[in-house]
């Protein structure tokens, strides 16, 4: 007896897409990307070209307008008087608009320059004689009185007050009779003082000079000056130990400040 055996066929192995299909997909992808980039570049070029054409058209219209205006001035061409007057009025309105814009720009530049620059703040005053002299010297509101800005003022005839913070050069010159008989032989002392917005006072500068013994008046001068930071509402004044010895002649005793 003959026995037969049947063998099962082997399973077929799944294979991927052929190489030609892969190459086709790759080329298709490259083509699509290239087309997108080309379309974008063409759109940019077209946009710029349209802008250029628009500018050229505007220039051509301006050229035609100027030629027409020139013909109107010369009386050439077939334009009526009414059309020429209308063209001239348009041109005049255009010129007025340009001039107005230029004036506005100039005013804006001037305003910006003024805003960038700090206003000049300065003051110079001379002493004023008083029947009842006090240790804090008084200053004349007239004569050599100089105030260059409303940001500084003379208060109560004694103090120079500032309204803007900054560095100030403050100075004073006090002339006195060194040989005149005085209540004491103590040195003559002049002080430059600060009155702060909080109400406190302090000495900024101080100088002293000795007296002579002879009776005739021998004039001497004390000079004070320095740079200080002053705040809005602060004021400075001059104090002396013997106000009866101060000379109030023109140019002898003065006081002032200057914002740096």
From Swiss-Prot:
Keyword Acetylation attached: no
Description of post-translational modifications: The soluble form derives from the membrane form by proteolytic processing.
Gene Ontology BP annotations: B cell differentiation; B cell proliferation; CD40 signaling pathway; cell surface receptor signaling pathway; inflammatory response; integrin-mediated signaling pathway; isotype switching; negative regulation of apoptotic process
Annotated localization: Cell membrane; Cell surface
Known function: Cytokine that acts as a ligand to CD40/TNFRSF5. Costimulates T-cell proliferation and cytokine production. Its cross-linking on T-cells generates a costimulatory signal which enhances the production of IL4 and IL10 in conjunction with the TCR/CD3 ligation and CD28 costimulation. Induces the activation of NF-kappa-B. Induces the activation of kinases MAPK8 and PAK2 in T-cells. Mediates B-cell proliferation in the absence of co-stimulus as well as IgE production in the presence of IL4. Involved in immunoglobulin class switching.
Assembly and interaction partners: Homotrimer. Interacts with CD28. CD40 ligand, soluble form: Exists as either a monomer or a homotrimer. Forms a ternary complex between CD40 and integrins for CD40-CD40LG signaling.
Stated name of the protein: CD40 ligand
């Amino acid at each position: 007896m003959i026995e037969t055996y049947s063998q099962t066929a082997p399973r077929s192995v799944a294979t991927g897409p052929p190489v030609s299909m892969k190459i086709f997909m790759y080329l298709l992808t490259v083509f699509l990307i290239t087309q997108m980039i080309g379309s974008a570049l063409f759109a940019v070029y077209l946009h710029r070209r349209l802008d250029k054409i628009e500018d050229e058209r505007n220039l051509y219209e301006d050229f035609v307008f100027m030629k027409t205006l020139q013909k109107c001035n010369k009386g050439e061409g077939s334009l009526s008087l009414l059309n020429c007057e209308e063209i001239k009025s348009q041109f005049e309105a255009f010129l007025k608009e340009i001039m107005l814009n230029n004036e506005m720009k100039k005013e804006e530049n001037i305003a910006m320059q003024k805003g960038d620059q700090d206003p000049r703040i300065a003051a110079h005053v001379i002493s004023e004689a008083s029947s009842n002299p006090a240790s804090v010297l008084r200053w004349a509101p007239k004569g050599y009185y100089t105030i260059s800005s409303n940001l500084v003022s003379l208060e109560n005839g004694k103090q120079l007050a500032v309204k803007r913070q900054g560095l100030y050069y403050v100075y004073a010159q006090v002339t006195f009779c060194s040989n005149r008989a005085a209540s004491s032989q103590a040195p003559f002392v002049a002080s430059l003082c600060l009155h702060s917005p909080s109400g406190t006072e302090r000495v900024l500068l101080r100088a002293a000079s000795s007296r002579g013994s002879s009776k005739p008046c021998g004039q001497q001068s004390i000079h004070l000056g320095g740079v200080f930071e002053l705040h809005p509402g602060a004021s400075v004044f001059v104090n002396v130990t013997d106000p009866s010895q101060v000379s109030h002649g023109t140019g002898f005793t003065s006081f002032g400040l200057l914002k740096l």
